[in-house]
Amino acid sequence: MIIKGSNFSVMDNSGARKVQCIQTLEGKKPTSLLRVGDKIVVVIKKMEKRKGGKYKLKVKKSDVCYAVIVKSKQPVRRKSGIIVNAGENGVILLTKTKEPIGTRLTGVVFKEVQRTGLLKNVSISKYII
């Protein structure tokens, strides 16, 4: 069950590892359940460790960003009758203009993300389930 206050893993190379949902977007009530493809506002809780300092991280700890949910522990039922779920809740971080912050996605992305209209998120992912 994904609600306000849920923790997520970040599935891109923006530099963040763990985030927490602080607000829902697009007319959803704060108490409503969120699904794959919904947009949320998150705060960054944990960052990846920099080794050598050769590259600059795109976000900092305690930054507030937009995100879209790309996979969830909660089972998702499709029209064909197939039920899919993941081992963890995952998001992709977005800018204010709804463009992805990272340039590469790690892990799988559920096909339900396509209904959000964010086609660039789907195009940079390797695995779509």
Curated annotation (Swiss-Prot):
<keyword id="KW-0687">Ribonucleoprotein</keyword>
<dbReference type="GO" id="GO:0005762">
    <property type="term" value="C:mitochondrial large ribosomal subunit"/>
</dbReference>
<protein>
    <recommendedName>
        <fullName>Large ribosomal subunit protein uL14m</fullName>
    </recommendedName>
</protein>
<dbReference type="GO" id="GO:0003735">
    <property type="term" value="F:structural constituent of ribosome"/>
</dbReference>
<dbReference type="GO" id="GO:0006412">
    <property type="term" value="P:translation"/>
</dbReference>
<dbReference type="Pfam" id="PF00238">
    <property type="entry name" value="Ribosomal_L14"/>
</dbReference>
<comment type="subunit">
    <text>Component of the mitochondrial ribosome large subunit (39S) which comprises a 16S rRNA and about 50 distinct proteins.</text>
</comment>
<dbReference type="InterPro" id="IPR000218">
    <property type="entry name" value="Ribosomal_uL14"/>
</dbReference>
<comment type="similarity">
    <text>Belongs to the universal ribosomal protein uL14 family.</text>
</comment>
<dbReference type="InterPro" id="IPR036853">
    <property type="entry name" value="Ribosomal_uL14_sf"/>
</dbReference>
<keyword id="KW-0689">Ribosomal protein</keyword>
<keyword id="KW-0496">Mitochondrion</keyword>
<dbReference type="GO" id="GO:0070180">
    <property type="term" value="F:large ribosomal subunit rRNA binding"/>
</dbReference>
<dbReference type="InterPro" id="IPR005745">
    <property type="entry name" value="Ribosomal_uL14_bac-type"/>
</dbReference>
